[in-house]
Amino acid sequence: MNWDEFLDVNFVEEGEEWKQVTGYEPTEFDSVENLPVYQLAYQFTIDSINLIESRFENKNDESINAFAQSVIIPAAKIAGGFGMGFELEFIGGNIANCKRGLNAANRVLTALQEMRDKKILDQKTFQNFYSRGKEVRDELGIYIVELRERFRRGIP
C-alpha cells in the first residue's frame, strides 16, 4: 500500500463500517469542531487575528503582542485536551490542557484592557472583544468544572 492511498476517502471510510453494523450512533461531540466551547474560542481567535492583521500589523506594542500571542492558545488547548480523551486515565491531562487555555484567556483580557488604556483600541471595539473574550474565559472555566466533576464521579 502506498502512502497516497491514505488520501482516498473510500479507504478512510472503510474503517467506519463497524459503526454502521453495530448500530453505533455518533454523539454530537465526536469531534472537537462540534464542542460548543471550542467553537466559541475558535471563532474568537479568527476574529481576533483578523483584527490584529487589519489594524495592528505595523504597530509594535507590548500589549498587542501579548494579545496576539495569547489569543490562539485557548482554542488550541481545548482541542489538545479533547484529543487526550475523556477516559479516567487521560482526563487529568485534558483538564490540565484546558487550564492552560484558561490562563491564556485571562492574559487576553488583561491585554485588551491595556490596549484600551493606551487608546490603541476604541471603546466600541474594546467592548466587543472584551465581552467575547470574557465569554470564552467563562465558558472554558465551566467546561473545566464539568471535566473535574466527570473525573470525580468516575464517568468516562
What residue ranges belong to the model's regions?
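Amphipathic alpha-helical assembly/interaction segments
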Residues: 1-156
